[in-house]
């Protein structure tokens, strides 16, 4: 598994309750561009339209040897999930307060581009502070155990 892009702020801004792996529909030049690590999912989000999931606001740079004239690097890209996963995701969204965020974009062992998504709930400012305090405390504990 080769990670191409990761959403590093996802764990800071959201509480992730469930993770789902989805395939992503790409053109050939987009796949070649991702193989040389020119993609980003920072600030991207997933929406549901007409019973399908779409990745919006992701950026995949145009492949330099591509001959596409009107290439849009931040176009919507369709996500491929099973019916059961889609029902689970749409149920969480309709429940309220939950959203779907992309966590990482990678190539599977078979060479397919995959997107790891998380069903998440947004954190408030005090929740973010609590998670920072908890992380710092865990670091201090490790240092104390290491020194003793």
What function would you assign to each model-found segment?
Residues 1-2, 131:
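N-terminal nucleotide/polyanion-binding subdomain common to many enzyme families
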Residues 2-98:
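Ribosome large-subunit tunnel/peptidyl-transferase-proximal elements
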Residues 51, 72-74, 106, 119, ...:
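Short, charged/polar low-complexity linear motifs in solvent-exposed/disordered segments
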Residues 67-69, 124-127:
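Short small-residue beta-strand/loop micro-motif enriched in glycine and branched aliphatics
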Residues 60, 128-145:
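Flexible glycine-rich active-site/ligand-binding loops centered on an Asp-His dyad
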Residues 82-118, 122-124:
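Beta-rich strand-turn-strand
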Residues 148:
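Surface-exposed, charge/polar-rich loops and edge strands
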């Amino acid at each position: 598994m080769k990670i191409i892009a990761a959403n590093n702020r996802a764990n800071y801004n959201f509480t992730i309750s469930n993770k789902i792996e989805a395939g992503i529909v790409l053109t050939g030049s987009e796949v070649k561009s991702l193989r040389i690590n020119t993609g980003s999912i920072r600030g991207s989000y997933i929406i549901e339209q007409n019973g399908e999931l779409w990745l919006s606001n992701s950026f995949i740079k145009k492949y330099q040897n591509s001959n596409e004239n009107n290439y849009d690097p931040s176009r919507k890209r369709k996500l491929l999930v099973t019916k059961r996963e889609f029902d689970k995701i749409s149920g969480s969204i309709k429940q309220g307060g939950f959203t779907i965020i992309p966590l990482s974009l990678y190539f599977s062992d078979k060479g397919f581009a995959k997107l790891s998504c998380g069903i998440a709930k947004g954190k408030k400012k005090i929740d973010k502070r609590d998670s920072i305090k908890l992380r710092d405390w865990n670091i201090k504990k490790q240092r104390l155990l290491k020194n003793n």
